[in-house]
Regions:
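Carboxylate-rich, polar loop motifs that coordinate divalent cations or form catalytic acidic clusters
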Residues: 1-201
Length: 201
């Protein structure tokens, strides 16, 4: 393994293992028990990996936007932020990817909120402080049983209804241990209980 700082691991439905590191993307080779470095993401800090319901792979990078790998066609596509295009990716520092129960893909960024991918038009819808969110730094998204999306930030916790786009913000004033949450610290168990990690627990 050519990079020791592994940040994320994804095992696909076909059994392939992909590893995101601070120095690029690797794919594990079972037959030779070694790794192939993926040229398309060479030297790129790969923060998160997600396999969507179609079997496509999405890769979040720390400064190079999002990459999508179409497994069937074996083609890559890079989505980048464009200041002149409000329907582009909101920011190139993407730290988390989430697919909800409606099969919608969401991308959380470190500085420009989060966005939803629109497959019909191959573009994005942006959500940030200009739309009433408490921060533009979004660490993690988790869905509850009612379809609400819970977003952790560096300035509180947000409960967001993606259908009505209504939201409620929770802070230490509502009993949170801290308004500052941690990267990738969120989980919903089989009973629907949600666990979210902050700097104070």
């Amino acid at each position: 393994m050519s990079a020791n700082d592994a940040f994320t691991i994804c095992k696909t439905t076909t059994g392939d293992v992909w590893i995101g590191t601070t120095a690029g993307l690797l794919k594990y080779n079972r037959s030779s028990d070694d790794f192939t470095r993926i040229a398309e993401l060479k030297s790129m800090f790969t923060y998160d990996i997600l396999e969507d319901f179609n079997g496509n792979l999405w890769f979040a990078t720390f400064s190079n936007g999002v990459f999508c790998y179409n497994v069937r066609s074996q083609k890559w596509k890079n989505y980048l932020s464009n200041e002149k295009d409000s329907a582009s990716l909101s920011y190139n520092k993407v730290i988390s990817i989430y697919e909800d129960s409606r099969k919608c893909l969401w991308f959380m960024t470190l500085g420009e909120g989060f966005c939803r991918y629109n497959p019909e038009t191959d573009n994005f819808t942006r959500y940030d402080m200009s739309k009433g969110f408490p921060s533009n730094t979004i660490y993690k998204m988790v869905e509850d049983k009612r379809g609400n999306l819970w977003l952790t930030t560096n300035n509180g916790l947000v409960c967001f209804n993606p259908e009505t786009e209504s939201k409620h913000v929770y802070t230490t004033a509502n009993g949170l241990l801290s308004n500052q949450f941690n990267f990738q610290s969120g989980y919903c168990d089989r009973k629907g209980r949600i666990y979210l990690g902050s700097i104070n627990g």
